[in-house]
Amino acid sequence: MKKSDLVKGLKELGLKKNDIVLMHSSFRSLGDFKGSVDDVIDAFMSVLGPKGALIVPVFGSLGILPERVKARKDVFISEVPVGTLAGIGGRAKDVLSGHWEAETAHGEGSPFLKIAEAGGYICLLGVDQDRNTTLHSAEALLKLPYLGSCTRTCKAPDGKEVTRTWHYYPGPHRDFIGLDHIMRESGIMEVSRIGDAQVRLIKAKEMLELMVELGDEDPAFALCDNPACADCVRQRAAIFADRIANESFKLSVSSRLAGHYVPEMIEKLQAAGIKYVELDYVQGKACTFMDAQQLKRIVDDFKEAKITVSALRSYVVPEDTNGFVGKMKEAGIDRVILPLFDFFYGASAFAKEGIVVDFVNTHVTPSQAVQALLKVAPLKRRAFVFSPSGFVLAGKNPFLNAWRVGQFIKTIAQLDVNDRTWDGEIRSFAKGNGEIKELVSILRCHNFSGWLTLGGGSPYPGNLEAAVKDFTHLLDTI
């Protein structure tokens, strides 16, 4: 293949005079090219003309073509140490200048956006979408929660050494390759063979508009779904954590649902993006019956992993209230969930030591729950943990009956996110008679600031990953 063949191929692909093109390339992909690296660059410039611009990335070792462009006498290089671009041609300076003033390396004010706004193109010469840096611009425009920051000490355009930070900076793995068919099917990308190279020419503005639309619908649009990819698992967790942070409620998970051993629980909670755990069972043993040292070790392990214990749930009334209070204080647990019953004296013992006591309904009717709560009325705090499964097992509709009869909006501190059928069969969320969807919906209407606990007070018919998916679907359909 000769230089003239490359010129012809680029024109047939859609490039024309005065265009701006950002090229990502592999010189070797052209195969038996009868010419030099400079001949490839000259072929592009003969198509673009003196008023066009050929832009290449130079923020790392990205191949011989970018290096040769960077070495040209008439080159203009953007002034930043991250996302750096070099360009030649009449429009290169206009596109690349001002990169230093942009708050992000790839977003607003960056050359990547300027190329798109000017109607420019992205050319992938013998490389795939994995090299398409402008896709990071879509992430930056969306301000996706898994993006980080990049800080560098470098010389400013005035020659002074400064330290500055670029926000919404991309991190590790993406599944940009998986976006290729979407571009092709949408008609914003032309694909052709030039020599041995598969060449893609993409309309930059249309690509960004499409990617932002995809990202608005699904913030994980650029991530892979491989459970063995730790990078994308972590980034998906950041998306979920950000979503929950924008809710009024706080989300916790029962330790029984999180796993068997504490290290396993930590790994799964972090993978899900959940920062709170409610202690009920660890290694198959009820936390109620653990000694203070065991509890403290568990709490400390979670704390080291930046996971906070939201409460300890006891399924029985402690016989030795003072001893139970003592080990909770030693372990650093400041909230306990107890079965609802006449327990004013014991509850007072917790309150005196600064431990919050919340009561949960277990096999009681709504009216019985109200009466039991009245018996602890002398306490400053009279808070209720609403268990849909508990009311189902008591033969009452949790929302249509119990919620209204008990007027629990006045006392609720936590909603246990669980579900069952009338005959006691455990179900995934909103698949039983627990009316969990209605309960979550009404709490959101009130901007409820208390706890929602996945698997609280009842087993879940699956693992934590499945529970989070079910809960996400629940939120999506409200």
Where are the language model's segments positioned?
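Active-site-proximal loop/turn and secondary-structure-junction residues that shape catalytic pockets
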Residues: 27-29, 60, 257-259, 281-283, ...
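Glycine-rich, proline-tolerant flexible connector loops at the mouths of alpha/beta enzymes
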Residues: 278-299
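Histidine-acidic metal/acid-base catalytic patches
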Residues: 246-255, 259-273, 292, 327, ...
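Structural preference for beta-strand elements that scaffold enzyme active sites
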Residues: 20-22, 248-252, 276-278, 306-313, ...
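Active-site acidic/histidine proton-transfer and metal-coordination neighborhood
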Residues: 264-267, 308-394
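Short, conserved active-site loops that position catalytic residues or coordinate cofactors/metal ions
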Residues: 19-28, 57-58, 272-283, 313
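Catalytic-core regions built around general acid/base machinery
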Residues: 39-48, 293-304, 345-353, 438-443
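N-terminal and secondary-structure boundary signal
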Residues: 1-246
